[in-house]
């Protein structure tokens, strides 16, 4: 895959990180995704930003328009508010910072401006106990590159070629302190404001409909646990064997996907030994549930009836065949008895 094909793919990967499988139930998050391309062709922007609250898109910004555009009904009336203007100014500042960082990284790699991309994800999460966690990560040409550590005010290099930029940025302590102030103070405050605006929309909770289905293919028995029609999309699904968690490596999971009606769906599957299906339980946690929900595979009544009918027919066929065989044997025995009393006449 060439450099031009990577940006869209990596951006999709970033979007998947927004999915709440990585965010605990009953927490809230504010995330910004930035992407830029060194060449303005093939539909790739120099800088584009998308903002998400609890995984719901609420704002978009690009280098050409240089303004924040609302992407959710619950923020439409805030275009002229002081906080929205501050948000717009922040995005303009990030626009400039992003481009400067982009050129710095390319220079440190001795790269020309042809066919390179930069991606950033930054934001914060607020847990149910009001504790917070901030994050600020860079990706270059589709690979993890640098991550800011607010506790130590330094940068962690995800690859060796990022070391030069890491050392250069760590000299700038003013920027590091500004980054930490945003992650630990400004971001949680902005998130609280947005949650207030979205009250009644963002705080709605629709519990999932959970069912377990049974599949047999190529001599492999699989149980699939489906969670349907839930909101918000942060959900935790796991398999239990004899009430103990199964290693996640043994299970196949599906990303949380929109259902098309404002709700979400997901599933997790597990291959099990035939005949041991009842030992496995699917456990689901979701903000709409007061406690974890469990579900097991229940053989359907129709399957039971079909099995019973087939078994009954098989028994009847066997009895019928035994009866026919019995009659044939009796006839043979009768024929042998008649032949025993018959004597051939002598020739005269």
Swiss-Prot record:
Residues 206-297 are annotated as: Alpha-3. Residues 207-296 form the Ig-like C1-type domain. The chain crosses the membrane at residues 307-330. It is found in: Cell membrane. GO terms for molecular function: transferrin receptor binding. Glycans are attached at residues 110, 130, 234. It is a single-pass type I membrane protein. It comes from the Eukaryota. Residues 298-306 are annotated as: Connecting peptide. PROSITE patterns: IG_LIKE, IG_MHC. One of its GO terms (cellular component) is extracellular space. Residues 331-348 are cytoplasmic. Residues 115-205 are annotated as: Alpha-2. Disulfide bonds join 124-187, 225-282. The keyword Disulfide bond applies. Residues 23-114 are annotated as: Alpha-1. Keywords: Cell membrane, Disulfide bond, Glycoprotein, Ion transport, Iron, Iron transport, Membrane, Signal, Transmembrane, Transmembrane helix, Transport. InterPro entries: Ig-like_dom (IPR007110), Ig-like_dom_sf (IPR036179), Ig-like_fold (IPR013783), Ig/MHC_CS (IPR003006), Ig_C1-set (IPR003597), MHC_class-I_related (IPR050208), MHC_I-like_Ag-recog (IPR011161), MHC_I-like_Ag-recog_sf (IPR037055). Binds to transferrin receptor (TFR) and reduces its affinity for iron-loaded transferrin. Belongs to the MHC class I family. PANTHER family: HEREDITARY HEMOCHROMATOSIS PROTEIN, MHC CLASS I-RELATED. This is Hereditary hemochromatosis protein homolog. The gene is HFE.
